[in-house]
């Protein structure tokens, strides 16, 4: 007797359709008008290791280190309120204007130099590279004064949203932990803000939460979070607003090899070594196996600089090809090749002989920037498809353009009182429309306002002349040669020359 059985093969249905992300080149029309904008000389001076506070709530001297991120929030003028070269360039009823970043140069002042970082009480037990003898067990306090030069990093990252960083932080444990247990680690993402510490060679992690001894790393990152740009996340971002492009150069080598003092939370398993004989110079008590190096960025040279050079954006890595939504640009910079820490000495008491106590020593670090941009004027036609796409991407863009999208019909009945000032009803004065909040107001950036620094005379600026040269364009001459006219004379012809005669 034959029996029918259904097929055991699984049936795979096609995935549901999703909205496709398109490039800005599909709906942004570029014009032939370019503008130059540059900041003034941007300076920052402070202490390279920590913030100086006179009172708990008042900062006297900020922390300014060559190992910090500098994040500039560049404000641009609204092109829809901009004085345009042609009145018929666009139709304000059906079109809107936007800026596109096509050129950039980050200028750095100050000489090249290497700044030292360190800790007067660093957890440094033994020299594990050239140990002359097998070290005995650690004492109660083996901390020493150690300084080092850190990893060398140069970074320039541009987008219309802040860059995203990653670091390892303390995660939530599944069960209760005892004192001294290793906390679970969690990869965390956060916005890179101005003043955040970059990776200096000790990893991207939250040192204040994961190193409670305050003796494991140098002073400048001890109570901080070292962040590393999450290039994978920003590259995979759907619209490509966080990163148009980036320039990066990193190098590091190991200078010294040490180990750390302390009780090993996870001792070396006994099956990984053979025990020493009795009395073998203390080798039955294993030394600390928590090894770590001191980093070094090696030589600093002008041949390997990514700054003070122009860069042109032809095609961005994401779908946003340089369009500055919200009329702003976020520029993230790291440059450890100019991290010189200046020593300042002030006299306390003047004597004929030298005494170190007669002087006070101070540390300062100074940074100098000059930012130049080339922007292209673009226009967008407000069709139904384009407006729907932009509303899905970021509805705040349409709000800034004063373009409203009709909301769906509401099924609720709203109340409207006749006498608003009447005391017989609840107070209507407290019912106010919510103000529009800046989505980045909770973060710290270096504000740079270029609203009044746009110029169409590209040949009057260094970056503008470079742009004209690489684009094969020539500026129109400002001066025209004027032909000199002959002066009018009363005589119609010049007098004839006298002939020479022979005698």
Curated annotation (Swiss-Prot):
One of its GO terms (cellular component) is T=7 icosahedral viral capsid. This is Major capsid protein L1. Forms an icosahedral capsid with a T=7 symmetry and a 50 nm diameter. The capsid is composed of 72 pentamers linked to each other by disulfide bonds and associated with L2 proteins. Binds to heparan sulfate proteoglycans on cell surface of basal layer keratinocytes to provide initial virion attachment. This binding mediates a conformational change in the virus capsid that facilitates efficient infection. The virion enters the host cell via endocytosis. During virus trafficking, L1 protein dissociates from the viral DNA and the genomic DNA is released to the host nucleus. Belongs to the papillomaviridae L1 protein family. Pfam families: Late_protein_L1. Residues 479-503 are annotated as: Disordered. It is found in: Virion; Host nucleus. InterPro entries: Capsid_L1_Papillomavir (IPR002210), Capsid_L1_sf_Papillomavir (IPR036973), dsDNA_vir_gr_I_capsid (IPR011222). GO terms for biological process: endocytosis involved in viral entry into host cell; virion attachment to host cell. One of its GO terms (molecular function) is structural molecule activity. Transmembrane segments: none annotated. It comes from Human papillomavirus type 32. Coiled coil: none annotated. The gene is L1. Keywords: Capsid protein, Disulfide bond, Host nucleus, Host-virus interaction, Late protein, T=7 icosahedral capsid protein, Viral attachment to host cell, Viral penetration into host cytoplasm, Virion, Virus endocytosis by host, Virus entry into host cell. The lineage of its organism: Viruses, Monodnaviria, Shotokuvirae, Cossaviricota, Papovaviricetes. Self-assembles into homopentamers. The capsid has an icosahedral symmetry and consists of 72 capsomers, with each capsomer being a pentamer of L1. Interacts with the minor capsid protein L2; this interaction is necessary for viral genome encapsidation. Interacts with protein E2; this interaction enhances E2-dependent replication and transcription activation.
């Amino acid at each position: 007797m034959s029996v029918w059985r259904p097929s055991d093969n699984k049936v795979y249905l096609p995935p549901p359709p999703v909205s496709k992300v398109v490039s800005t080149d599909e709906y942004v029309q570029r014009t032939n008008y370019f503008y130059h904008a540059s900041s003034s000389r941007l300076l920052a001076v402070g202490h390279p290791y920590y913030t100086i506070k006179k009172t708990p709530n008042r900062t006297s001297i900020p922390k300014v280190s060559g190992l910090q991120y500098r994040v500039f929030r560049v404000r641009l003028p609204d092109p829809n309120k901009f004085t345009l070269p042609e009145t018929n360039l666009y139709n304000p009823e059906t079109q809107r204007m936007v800026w596109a970043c096509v050129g950039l140069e980050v200028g750095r002042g100050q000489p090249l130099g290497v700044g030292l970082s360190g800790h007067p009480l660093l957890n440094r037990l033994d020299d594990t590279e050239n140990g002359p003898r097998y070290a005995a067990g650690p004492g109660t306090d083996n901390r020493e004064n150690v300084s080092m030069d850190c990893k060398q990093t140069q970074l320039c990252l541009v987008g219309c949203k802040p860059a995203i960083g990653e670091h390892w932080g303390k995660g939530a444990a599944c069960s209760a932990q005892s004192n001294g247990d290793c906390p679970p680690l969690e990869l965390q993402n956060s916005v890179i803000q101005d003043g955040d510490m970059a990776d200096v060679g000790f990893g991207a992690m939250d040192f204040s939460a994961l190193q409670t001894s305050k003796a494991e790393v140098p002073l400048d990152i001890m109570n901080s979070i070292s962040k590393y740009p999450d290039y994978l996340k920003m590259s995979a971002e759907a619209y490509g607003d966080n990163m148009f492009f980036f320039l990066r150069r990193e190098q590091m080598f190991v200078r010294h090899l040490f180990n750390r003092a302390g009780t090993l939370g996870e001792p070396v398993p006994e099956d990984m070594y053979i025990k020493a004989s009795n009395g073998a110079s203390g080798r039955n008590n294993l030394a600390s196996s928590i090894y770590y190096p001191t980093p070094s960025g090696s030589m600093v040279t002008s041949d390997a600089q990514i700054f003070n050079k122009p860069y042109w954006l032809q095609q961005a890595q994401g779908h946003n090809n340089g369009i500055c939504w919200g009329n702003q640009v976020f520029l993230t910079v790291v440059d450890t090749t100019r991290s010189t820490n200046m020593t300042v000495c002030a006299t306390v008491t003047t004597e004929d002989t030298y005494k170190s106590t007669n002087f006070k020593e101070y540390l300062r670090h100074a940074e100098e920037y000059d930012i130049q941009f080339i922007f292209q004027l673009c226009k967008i036609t407000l069709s139904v498809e384009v407006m729907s796409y932009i509303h899905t991407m970021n509805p705040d863009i349409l709000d800034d353009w004063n373009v409203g999208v009709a909301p769906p019909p509401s099924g609720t009945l709203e109340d409207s009182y006749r006498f608003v000032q009447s005391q017989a009803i609840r107070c209507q004065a407290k019912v106010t429309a919510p103000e529009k909040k800046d989505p980045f107001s909770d973060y710290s950036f270096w504000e740079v306002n270029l609203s009044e620094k746009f110029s169409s005379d590209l040949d009057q600026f260094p970056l503008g002349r470079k742009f004209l040269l690489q684009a094969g364009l020539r500026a129109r001459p400002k001066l025209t040669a004027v032909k000199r006219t002959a002066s009018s004379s009363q005589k119609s012809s010049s007098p004839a020359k006298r002939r020479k005669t022979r005698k």
